[in-house]
Amino acid sequence: MIEICCGSYEDALNAYYGGAKRIELNSALHLGGLTPSIGSLKLTKNTTNLKVICMVRPRGAGFCYTDIEFKQMMIEAKDLLENGADGIAFGFLLKNNEIDIERTKEMVSLIKSYQKEAVFHRAYDCVKDPYASIEILINLGIDRLLTSGLRAKAADGKDLIKKLQTKYGDKIEILAGSGINSTNGQAIMEYTGIAQIHSSCKDWQNDQTTSGEFVNYCYGPAEHKDDFDMVSKELVEKLVKLGL
C-alpha cells in the first residue's frame, strides 16, 4: 500500500490520477502538516474513491498541547469524521516526550465511535523509548503507526522499523514515511518487511506573486523562493508502477 501525503484538494487529485489508493490529507505541509479544511475533504470524497486519512494538528512544532488546543483538535476530528474522513492521524506527547495516554485514549474513543481508523503520526519519532511507546499505542487501540524509525529519514531509521515490524507487525500496522520515493521505496519495504509506505511525491510550482518589492512570502529553499510545493502526478505514477 502506498499512501500519498497531500496538502490540498489539488494534491489529492494528483495523487488519485497518479494511481494512489489512500492519502493523508493535510494543510500547510511546510509546517509538517496541519488540519485540512472541510472543503478539501468534501471535494476529495465527492470526486474520487480515495481512502482519506485526515491530519488533526492545530499548529507546527511539537505535540504537547494546551487544553485549548486539545479542545480544538477534538472538535476538528469530529467534524472531519462527520464529513467522510476514513481515519484520523494525530499525536499527543507529554512534556517528557512520552505518549500522552489520556488524550490519546480520548481521541481513539472518538474515532472508534465512527468505526474509522486511528493513526498515530510521527510524533512517535520524538519519543525516547520506541518499544514502550509502541506497546502503549497498541494497548490504546491505535490501528497504524507512521514512523521514520526515530530518524530524520526512514532510510536511516530502517533498522528500527524492521525491529518494530518483526516484533509488533501482527498487532499494529507499521507505515514508514519521510524521504521515501520511487528510488528507495521498494528497498525499504523489502528490508523492513513492512507492507505500507508514505510519500509526499513533492514537486514545486511557481507563483510570481510570492514576492513583492519589499515583502516575500517564500517558505521554500532559495532555489524555490517563488514556488510552492505540491504533489506530482508523475512522481506518484513512478511509485505506483513499482507495484508495492
Located regions from the model:
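Glycine-rich phosphate-binding active-site loops on the catalytic face of alpha/beta enzymes
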Residues: 24-34, 79, 83-95, 142-155, ...
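Hydrophobic faces of well-ordered beta-strands that scaffold small-molecule active sites
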Residues: 2-6, 23-25, 52-56, 88-90, ...
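Conserved, mostly hydrophobic/aromatic
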Residues: 15, 80, 107, 121, ...
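C-terminal alpha-helical cap/extension of soluble enzyme domains
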Residues: 60, 168-244
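Glycine/small-residue-rich loop that forms an oxyanion/phosphate-binding "nest" at active or ligand-binding sites
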Residues: 39, 44, 50-104
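Active-site-adjacent beta->alpha loops and helix N-cap segments on the catalytic face
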Residues: 10, 29-48, 68, 93-111, ...
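Catalytic cores of alpha/beta
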Residues: 7-14, 64-76, 125-140, 164, ...
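Glycine-enriched alpha-helix->loop->beta-strand junction motifs that scaffold or abut catalytic
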Residues: 18-23, 48-50, 84-87, 113-115, ...
